[in-house]
Amino acid sequence: MAEQIAPEEAHRQALVGELRLIDLRDQAEVLASGVIEIAEPLADRPLPQLLAESRQAVALMCQRGVRSARLCAEAADSSPVRLLNVAGGFEAWRAAGLPVNEPRSPFSARERERYLRHFALPEVGEAGQLKLRRASVLLVGAGGLGSPAALYLAAAGLGRIVIVDDDRVERSNLQRQVLHAEAGIGQLKVDSASARLRALNPDIEIETRALRLGRDTVDACVADVDLVIDGSDNFPTRYLLNAACLRHARPLLYAAVERFSGQLGLFAPGRSGQPCYRCLFPDAPGPGEVPNCAEAGVLGVLPGIIGTLQTLEALKMLLGLGDSLLGQVLVVDGLQMSFRKIRVSPDPECPECGS
């Protein structure tokens, strides 16, 4: 069993140099809870090495005293110095009124608590969260695909979300458009979305534009964002977005759903050797060839799955993580629970980027 030391006694001994206080908490815990200036972070050092270098007793402290007690018990017999566990860990230290300083961070205490699980990911951390805070995304459509995308972008701390939609909330939307509620029927979707997202995360900027994208409006919407997420439901809008993304060199995340299936793809028009959306669909289908959701129906959860996958790709791209869907389309069959990727080749005859 680990030898215990009270936080007050550990503090007294550390102040006079009788004890070396080692903080086992990770960066996420420190950012969320606070810094103990007289404690050293263990960081990446092996504990046996630290003990071998010590000339005085060592006390280990974690968030609640559990992890540190286990390490003390495991290392006590082989330790060349006296090894103690700070009883109750950081929480007992703080409860005793001992000194705790605010961490040096660009995030407020509330934000550090909110994004704790991001800070715990080495691939994201504070630096990645700053990237998200500084990023801006255009979300076209606050419907079935746009609902999960908007919610998860806001929850992730995306700094600025621009939502474009000219529709109003209808009761038939609520089977799949989880951004809206019964009380919002008749409201503009952008207003309903803005209220919901501000309630979810008041620290981000939500910009709304109650309009239908056209040739006279699309460039202004695309030019001042980092990434475009297409949650529209028609080919003319997708072609407009693709052309604008080509002009302004913005990545485009496309998605579509029908009945029990969906697909999504990431295009970076303008990049050497990369296809655009129109390489995939050179011409719009004729009238009645591709029914919309109102005609064919859609299982309510499908837009949630596809829209969430869109958001995953968006966050990966903004953070520079993993392998993206760039130049590919992911096809999801909900009934068979199958996922397959199709690589899209640049089309030299493409009416948009072929020249």
Give the role of each language-model region:
Residues 1-9, 85:
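N-terminal intrinsically disordered, low-complexity tails enriched in polar/charged
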Residues 1-3, 18-20, 24-33, 40-57, ...:
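Adenine nucleotide-associated cytosolic modules
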Residues 82-92:
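Non-catalytic regulatory/accessory regions that flank a structured catalytic core
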